[in-house]
Each structure stands twice: as structure tokens, then as C-alpha cells.
Amino acid sequence: MKKFFQEIKADIKFKSAGPGQKLTESVGEKAPKEKPSQPPVRQPRQGPTNEAQMAAAAALARLEQKQPRARGPTSQDSIRNQVRKELRAEAAVSGDPEAPGSNTAPEPKEEGSAHLAVPGVYFTCPLTGAILRKDQRDARIREAILMHFSTDPVAASIMKIHTFNKDRDRVKLGVDTIAKYLDNIHLHPEEEKYRKIKVQNKVFQERIHCLEGTHEFFEAIGFQKVLLPIPDQEGPEEFYVLSEAALAQPQSLEWHKEQLLSAEPVRATLARQRRVFRPSTLASQFDLPADFFNLTAEEIKREQRLRSEAVERLSVLRTKAMREREEQREMRKYTYTLLRVRLPDGCLLQGTFYARERVAALYGFVREALQNDWLPFELLASGGQKLSEDENLAFNECGLVPSALLTFSLDAAVLEDIRAAGTQPDTSILKPELLSAIEKL
């Protein structure tokens, strides 16, 4: 059997070697005439012809049909696999990506951003207003906070405490301990012991020293690090001591404490990437980038196989609990959603949202784009389903992920009042600056 496949391979190589030659034919008669000044160009090795590939594939198929179905893997299976590997290796050398016997489909090429409904998911830094990619968020926010020390060291140190330290429980414990220190100073300004904090104190080390930004905070509100002698101890100890100038302004200390307690981590906000498109028959077609899916590359590939299994699941009797569990798993696949709203004139308003955001966020997004933001309106999903602004439902709970097309509808009573007043609704309800940047979908 091995000899059989070697003959197939030899036949493929023979047929790909080019046209035959006569033994009596001289080299000069065969070789093309070339200019003496130009070196001969080496021709690339030709891969197997389509006929040779089809012959090899047909031979493999005939052999597979002859094998008994009930038998497990045999030595001939190993031979076939080896032949496939060798043919693929030879095809790789000759530059032919579609060698016979290859079971691996070529990787799909990523489409350019010009074909995507949106180029990707982007974020806005709340401190600088810069537009950031997902992988830039942490580094750029850290950089912005550190730069803020030159203008407002107290605010910068508070942002550093709440943003750089990811363990929220540890941050709360440390912040509460600092607040307790400041409360003691505020309540007992005459007590010198409350104005000194021992750095090597166990509570300070376990709750405060381990947090980034705490030392900068103490220094920013008026503490100074000094070495003080300790009774019955040879060497001095390091303390934070509140300066007299800071002690004379107790209201400032109280304000800084409230800032520290009420602060939140600095997070980049999702950029809506608002766009307006002309009326289009492609309004319901969405080609989304990979950023919109909370899946790895392997999981995305597996989705195609799972879709074929969905047909089988529909024929199986499932309980309500089983269906709900499957729906929950489906919702968790998506992190973001791209929503389009078709306006009365047919134009499309598009924006990016978190899949977990509430429907009210979409209403606010649309209202910001209207010339008259007081106009009452409704948003209708596919099938005419009304989405209430007051409902506390997320987009993934409404089935509006990873993309959806909705319809804008003005309140019927408002339209009647406008017509009764002898006026007609505006041709477009969007702000002029948005219409000036309208695009073709």
C-alpha cells in the first residue's frame, strides 16, 4: 500500500516537471535566447496540476470506500495520513495552498474596516477627552492621572487610590482608616498624638501602606514625613506629622476626607461613535468587528457548529428552565451592541452601547440628536414591539444584541396637535450639524 502511494506521488511530481525533451535535442535549441547583459532568471518550481491533485484525491477516496466501516484505525489509515502530510508539505514548498488530501480550511481573512458597520470599539478618557482603543485604556488613564499631579495633587492622589488599586474591599478598608485618622484630628485638634501617624504601625502597614496613592495623599493634604525618637528605643521611627498650616484649616481637611470617601475609579467611557446615514436598503445588515463579541477566536469558530446543532435542539422537548439557561448563555456572549434607529425621513442614526446598558440610554442618545429634544417619541423593535423608556431592561434582555434596527415613531397626539396648528413637521428632526456629516451606508 505504501508503494501505491509512492507511485501516486511520483506521478504527481512527473506531471509537474514540465514538457518532455528529446535526448538528441541540444541545450542551445531548447534554451530561450537571452541578452548577455541579463543573468538568467530562475523559474519558480511549479506545483502539482489540478488534474494530478484530483487524481490523488480520487485515489484516496476509492481507498476509503474499500475500508470496512466497522474497523477502527489501521496501518493504512496511518499511511493515508502520512501521504496527506507529505503532499501538504510539498504543496507548501511549491506555493500551492490547496494540496489534495488537506482537511484544514484556510483561515478567513479579516475584512478591512471599510466593510465593517463600525471600525471597532473605542473609549473616551474622562480626563483628557482622548479617544482610546480597548487595549490603551489602562495605560492612558494612568498617564493622565500622573500628569494631573502637577495641577491638583490632592485630586490626583485620590484618583490614584481608587483607580490603581483593583481590590475594592481593600481600598474601602484603607480609605475608611484614613478617614478615621482625619476625624480624630478634626474632633481633637489640641491632641498632638492624633497629628502623628506611625508609618510602621501594623494597622497602617496592612491597610494603607500597601495601597498606591496613599502616601501622595498624605503629603498633598499637609502631612510631612519625619523621623522622631521613640522612648525606650535606640533608633528613631518614621512618622507622618500634620503641619501647622494644614492644622489651621480644619475645613480643608474635612473637605479632602469627603472627596476621598465619595470618589470612584476613573474609567474610560464607551464612545458612542454617533453616525448618520442616508436611507438605505442595507439598514438591517450589520458586519461587526470582533470587539463586539465576548468570545475568543476559537469560540467564534465554534459558533458555526453550534448553529447547526440549534436545529436539533428545536426538535427536542425542553423545559422552561432549560430554555432560560440557554438564553442566559446566549446573552453573555456579547459585550457591546450596535444599534440603528430609522427616523421618519428614512435616515439612520447609529451608536455603540454596552450590551448591559438600559433602554433609557438609547432614548437619551436619540434625544440628544433631535432639533427639539422635548418631542415625545417611541422606539419600536422588530415586529412592532414598543420599548418603554421607563422599563429597567438591558439591551441583552430585550434581544437587541449584538446589533438591531429600531424605528423612531413620534407620539400620535403630538402630530395631531402640530397639524391642527396649521404647520407641518420638519423634513428632518435631526440637528443640522449631524445632517451636515451624513454618510452613505
UniProtKB/Swiss-Prot annotation:
Residues 51-63 are annotated as: VCP/p97-interacting motif (VIM). Residues 332-408 form the UBX domain. Residues 175-244 form the PUB domain. Residues 1-10 are annotated as: Mediates interaction with LMAN1. Keywords: Cytoplasm, Cytoskeleton, Endosome, Lysosome, Membrane, Nucleus, Ubl conjugation pathway. It is found in: Cytoplasm; Cytoplasm, Cytosol; Membrane; Nucleus. One of its GO terms (cellular component) is centrosome. InterPro entries: PUB-like_dom_sf, PUB_domain, Ubiquitin-like_domsf, UBX_dom, UBXN6_PUB. It holds the Pfam family UBX. Interacts with VCP through the PUB domain (via C-terminus) and VIM motif (via N-terminus); the interaction is direct. Forms a ternary complex with CAV1 and VCP. Interacts with SYVN1. Interacts with HERPUD1. Interacts with VCPKMT. May interact with DERL1. Interacts with PLAA, VCP and YOD1; may form a complex involved in macroautophagy. Interacts with LMAN1. The UBX domain lacks key residues critical for VCP binding. May negatively regulate the ATPase activity of VCP, an ATP-driven segregase that associates with different cofactors to control a wide variety of cellular processes. As a cofactor of VCP, it may play a role in the transport of CAV1 to lysosomes for degradation. It may also play a role in endoplasmic reticulum-associated degradation (ERAD) of misfolded proteins. Together with VCP and other cofactors, it may play a role in macroautophagy, regulating for instance the clearance of damaged lysosomes. This is UBX domain-containing protein 6.
